[in-house]
């Protein structure tokens, strides 16, 4: 069964308050999202597999721990998820980065993939899906389904804020995927926005309406 981890570090909560503030402009918003993503990445990657290696320091030979295997793939959900990638790669520079773009057909309500580029060895990597907001959970759920179809086995979802409705949607569909958030917010409003939330993350990141 998946678990939900709220990373309530003082620095994360401070920066999240600035992100929520409607008076925070796009430049500061982008920088803050990257910073929070980097801080969250420390906890999200806590259980990555390690191997023992022997190295030689200027003094002597010794045994140390290093990451094992193919390491990490970061997969943002376009477009808002892109805002979290810089913070992640600053901490994990060797990570591969994939991209997933989805929209919902207005008639069938089924997800339509309009863009998908993933590392060829996605099945061998620990995959971290990024999206600043987990609202209804539809996009995240569909992106994770697509990743599994492409061979991904070890997936975790990382969001800044999440509504309980979105968390339930993802957990019901993907009980094997752990969810990491900076805040579990109150609810969704009638327009499907997270309350109190942070507005439209994509628009605030890129200065669009």
From Swiss-Prot:
Its cofactor is Mg(2+). Pathway: Pyrimidine metabolism; UMP biosynthesis via salvage pathway; UMP from uracil: step 1/1. Transmembrane segments: none annotated. Keywords: Allosteric enzyme, Glycosyltransferase, GTP-binding, Magnesium, Nucleotide-binding, Transferase. The keyword Glycosyltransferase applies. Uracil binds at residues 194, 199-201. One of its GO terms (molecular function) is uracil phosphoribosyltransferase activity. One of its GO terms (biological process) is uracil salvage. Belongs to the UPRTase family. Catalyzes the conversion of uracil and 5-phospho-alpha-D-ribose 1-diphosphate (PRPP) to UMP and diphosphate. This is Uracil phosphoribosyltransferase.
């Amino acid at each position: 069964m998946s678990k939900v981890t709220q990373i309530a570090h003082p620095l994360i909560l401070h920066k999240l308050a600035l992100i929520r503030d409607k008076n925070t402009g796009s430049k500061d918003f982008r920088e803050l999202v990257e910073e929070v993503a980097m801080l969250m990445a420390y906890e999200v990657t806590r259980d990555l597999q390690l191997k023992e290696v022997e190295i030689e320091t200027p003094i002597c030979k010794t045994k140390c721990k290093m990451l094992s295997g193919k390491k990490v793939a970061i997969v943002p959900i376009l477009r808002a998820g892109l805002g979290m990638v810089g913070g992640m790669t600053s901490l994990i520079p060797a990570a591969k980065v994939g991209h997933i773009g989805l929209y919902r057909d207005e008639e069938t309500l089924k997800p339509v993939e309009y863009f998908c580029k993933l590392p060829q060895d996605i099945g061998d990597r620990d995959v971290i899906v990024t999206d600043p907001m987990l609202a209804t959970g539809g996009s995240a759920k569909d992106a994770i389904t697509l990743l599994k179809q492409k061979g991904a086995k070890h997936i975790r979802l990382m969001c800044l804020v999440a509504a309980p409705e979105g968390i339930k949607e993802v957990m019901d569909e993907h009980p094997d995927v752990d969810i990491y958030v900076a805040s579990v917010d109150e609810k969704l409003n009638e327009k499907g926005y997270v309350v109190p939330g942070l507005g439209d993350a994509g628009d605030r990141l890129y200065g669009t309406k």
